[in-house]
Amino acid sequence: SVSNNLNDISKTHPHLLRKVADQWYGTHPYSDWIIKHAYRTLLKKGDKQALSLFGYENADLIQLHDLTCQSSRIAIGESLEFSFYIHSDRDQKVRIEYAIDFVKARGQRHQKVFKITETNIRKNETKPYTRIQSFKDLTTRKHYKGIHTLSVIINGEVKDSLDFQVC
């Protein structure tokens, strides 16, 4: 699709996607969807220009509280449940993601970012979030023992992190 091709181009030539976005974004809801989908890699990387285009400002006035995991140790094949709260000191559009630094076969680590939601938060509002991440081996992902890191990202900024053991 067009958005997939633009996303691929953005990985090596992000300025070209920005040119297309300048021409297409805001002209029609369909083209807006294409541009947003094309920007998915840059959004996951926390690219400030990409976040700004879609109305995500810096997250200085957003606090993350009580990031906890139900267990600090999980076995391969189990799931990690984690939760947290966010609170804002102003009305703001937020993109909430989490990243896991997975241990790979030779001990190196690879980060994968997962989107939780895109929403609005009101001034003085507190919102709870709970997610479950499976550590079951898949054909596309094999899990390895070791210390992994969970990070919560709001509008491209890591707000809190914690380590957990996969055994």
Model-derived features: positions:
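Alpha-helical scaffold domains
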Residues: S1-V166
